[in-house]
Amino acid sequence: GYDGVHFSFAARNVLPKPQQKPHPPLWLACSHRESILKAARLGIGALSFGFTNFDTTKQWVEAYHDTLRREAVPIGYSINPNLSVLSRLICCPSDSEAKRIEDKVHFWWYSFVHYFGYGSHKPGVTSLWDNYSKSDYKFEWDTGTIGTPEKISATLREYERAGLDQIVFSIEAGNISHEE
């Protein structure tokens, strides 16, 4: 269990138990730079959302690995030296089709920020799609993994140059039909 300043919870028997020996690598879900550095200090992998641009990616990758080298006190069986980013992946035959789909993906981000940021949701009353359609919310991150095969390939090469260890793709985001 845990008894802390801000919250407490009773001990639980977590099932299923990992059968792998040693224990599988540990990861921390990270939403900002400080949580990425916390993962490095704990000697575990950092799983984050996409960054704003490749320069920021490079800075965060370098900060993670520098902190890992200098300060890591592993909490697991071994160090998991990986920074991974979650990104949307939608491959389209043309730039115009990608732009049309990209707007629908932005709705997913708008919804995410609504529920975990600024929103005041009222079930049965709040229409996120209507609110999004009327909003002037600005999306400041790169969407290079939404586009033509050439654009996506170029984006992945930039992530590679920035030193990113892994990228995890999500294809089910936004107001997109199964056929799309």
Predicted features by range, described:
Residues S8-F9, N13-V14, P18-S31, L37, ...:
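Aromatic- and glycine-enriched pocket-lining scaffold segments that form the walls
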Residues S35-I36, T57, P93, N175-H178:
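Short catalytic/ligand-binding loop motif for oxyanion handling, primarily in non-cytosolic enzymes
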Residues H32-V61:
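A conserved active-site cap/scaffold subdomain adjacent to cofactor or substrate pockets
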Residues F51-F54, S170-E180:
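Glycine-rich, proline-tolerant flexible connector loops at the mouths of alpha/beta enzymes
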Residues L26-A29, I44-F49, P81-R88, I167-F169:
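Hydrophobic faces of well-ordered beta-strands that scaffold small-molecule active sites
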Residues G1-L15, D55-L164:
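An alpha-helical appendage that flanks or caps ligand/catalytic pockets
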Residues G4-F7, S31, I171-A173:
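Short, well-ordered beta-to-alpha junction loops that form the rim of enzyme active sites
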